[in-house]
Amino acid sequence: MLDIQLLRSNTAAVAERLAARGYEFDAARFNALEEQRKAVQVKTEELQASRNSISKQIGALKGQGKHEEAQAAMDQVAQIKTDLEQAAADLDAVQKELDAWLLSIPNLPHESVPAGKDETENVEVRKVGTPREFDFEIKDHVDLGEPLGLDFEGGAKLSGARFTVMRGQIARLHRALAQFMLDTHTLQHGYTEHYTPYIVDDTTLQGTGQLPKFAEDLFHVTRGGDETKTTQYLIPTAEVTLTNTVADSIIPSEQLPLKLTAHSPCFRSEAGSYGKDTRGLIRQHQFDKVEMVQIVHPEKSYETLEEMVGHAENILKALELPYRVITLCTGDMGFGAAKTYDLEVWVPAQNTYREISSCSNCEDFQARRMKARFKDENGKNRLVHTLNGSGLAVGRTLVAVLENHQNADGSINIPAALQPYMGGVAKLEVK
């Protein structure tokens, strides 16, 4: 959520920065609500002053035996009390409208973010690794994976489209990838592993920015036997739960940075994705991801963003996968991000790079929604900065390993770094 004081003092500048990311800020509406709020506040202050003044007179009037005048003054105070209650209700209504609107406004792009309308104007930062040249006709991950235990038909039978069953060697490889990622982040990069709920309340999703704007992208659930029919949600990413562990808290500055990681399933309705990536694992309703989150001092957040990109890159390098890093332009960034880098892995069968990680600095946007603060060296409470990144999406990493390390006979070479997690197995072969 944006700083309301920044909006009040720099409305035009904020509107211009939001326009760069394709959001039209209604300055006239904001100014009208602000005028309404100010008018109610002025009226409230005048009523309070009048009440206090008249209340002081009542005792004096009674002492002078002026009982009728004292009663009239008491009647005035009673009316003022009613007027104050109405003013409080009016102010609350205006404030609620402002707050609800603020929750729907995206973050401001950082000054270093390239301007652009959509993904076609993202900027490549670097490429690492050279895509392999095959001397045989390659297969995609579907044709490679099905003989090894990848079962799309079984997933569809159980749950519908965009669900998958894995068994045998593929299931083991999928598990090994997640364990390798977790071990790398905890043992080499200094993150603390977490296990968090997969079902959350709306306030939790509001804290990280998925609600209220993106409700259609979420899976909604209700408890059996719950007469209130309270809606909860399956998490779209462990970013939600990891980041919210610091909601409504004040962290001593010496404890920063907090580095959190978790392996979890992610559930997404993929609203608006009809017809996209219908074949294979690239776009699923349920997929696993190892998430990285850091809670940091505001002055350290952009340094931390570069560090987190490096942590995700280390996984790709260890798995011997070609990839590139791109900076998202203003028109392609996520709702809560001030700056985002995407890591895209080479997918041979598609002859292109596909997103496998997204690392974002949200600055204080989420922290303001969550009331996540730290106590600085002067004893003042300030908002932390929050960052998140995929480290990595497990299913897409599986796709990349299958396709980049395939052999002509359909077998798959296991990268050396992954072999200890596969019980020493160096190759997947159709049995």
Curated annotation (Swiss-Prot):
Q: Which residues make up the binding site for ATP?
A: R268, S269, E270, E355, I356, S357, S358
Where does the record place it? Cytoplasm
Name the enzyme's class: ligase
Q: Where does L-serine bind?
A: T237, A238, E239, E291, S390
GO BP terms in the entry: selenocysteine biosynthetic process; seryl-tRNA aminoacylation
Give the keywords, sorted: Aminoacyl-tRNA synthetase, ATP-binding, Cytoplasm, Ligase, Nucleotide-binding, Protein biosynthesis
Cite the annotated pathway. Answer: Aminoacyl-tRNA biosynthesis; selenocysteinyl-tRNA(Sec) biosynthesis; L-seryl-tRNA(Sec) from L-serine and tRNA(Sec): step 1/1
What GO molecular-function term can you cite, just one? serine-tRNA ligase activity
Q: Does the keyword Transmembrane apply?
A: no
Would the keyword Signal turn up in this protein's UniProt record? no
Q: Which GO terms describe its cellular component?
A: cytoplasm
Q: What is its EC number?
A: 6.1.1.11
Reaction catalysis annotation:
tRNA(Ser) + L-serine + ATP = L-seryl-tRNA(Ser) + AMP + diphosphate + H(+); tRNA(Sec) + L-serine + ATP = L-seryl-tRNA(Sec) + AMP + diphosphate + H(+)
Q: What does this protein do?
A: Catalyzes the attachment of serine to tRNA(Ser). Is also able to aminoacylate tRNA(Sec) with serine, to form the misacylated tRNA L-seryl-tRNA(Sec), which will be further converted into selenocysteinyl-tRNA(Sec).
So what family is this one in?
Belongs to the class-II aminoacyl-tRNA synthetase family. Type-1 seryl-tRNA synthetase subfamily.
State how it assembles.
Answer: Homodimer. The tRNA molecule binds across the dimer.
Free-text comment on this protein's domains from its UniProt entry: Consists of two distinct domains, a catalytic core and a N-terminal extension that is involved in tRNA binding.
Q: Which HAMAP family match?
A: Ser_tRNA_synth_type1
Identify this protein by name. Answer: Serine--tRNA ligase
Query: What organism is recorded for this protein?
Result: Neisseria meningitidis serogroup C (strain 053442)
